[in-house]
């Protein structure tokens, strides 16, 4: 018989920097999960992602206090900021433009996010990512 799922915990944790301090410790502690075991496993799994990049993670906690977790691609907004070299998006995106992004850069971000996006092909994924860029005050070229 399969284990009974007790709860799901959704967090954004910096890659390779999971530790028992907030927000990880309190979120896992209230469900009785071994915090250090999660931190070690998460840090190993995120070795290939840039250190410090926020990574969404969904932790499934079972009734016997064991757990599994799935990491997702970093948020599109963070990837866009990284690839364009911009520090932060515009506070008034329809008036103040803070930078430009090309179709090639959009495709690069879309390919990283493809498994997490609700898109059937690359064009649809690029369209989704370009919407995110526009909402940050970044001009989409091409």
From Swiss-Prot:
GO terms for biological process: translation. GO terms for molecular function: large ribosomal subunit rRNA binding; structural constituent of ribosome. Keywords: Methylation, Ribonucleoprotein, Ribosomal protein, RNA-binding, rRNA-binding. The keyword Ribonucleoprotein applies. GO terms for cellular component: cytosolic large ribosomal subunit. Gene3D superfamilies: Ribosomal protein L11, C-terminal domain, Ribosomal protein L11/L12, N-terminal domain. The keyword Ribonucleoprotein applies. One or more lysine residues are methylated. InterPro entries: Ribosomal_uL11, Ribosomal_uL11_bac-typ, Ribosomal_uL11_C, Ribosomal_uL11_C_sf, Ribosomal_uL11_N, Ribosomal_uL11_N_sf. Part of the ribosomal stalk of the 50S ribosomal subunit. Interacts with L10 and the large rRNA to form the base of the stalk. L10 forms an elongated spine to which L12 dimers bind in a sequential fashion forming a multimeric L10(L12)X complex. Forms part of the ribosomal stalk which helps the ribosome interact with GTP-bound translation factors. PANTHER family: 60S RIBOSOMAL PROTEIN L12, LARGE RIBOSOMAL SUBUNIT PROTEIN UL11M. Belongs to the universal ribosomal protein uL11 family. This is Large ribosomal subunit protein uL11. It comes from Ruthia magnifica subsp. Calyptogena magnifica.
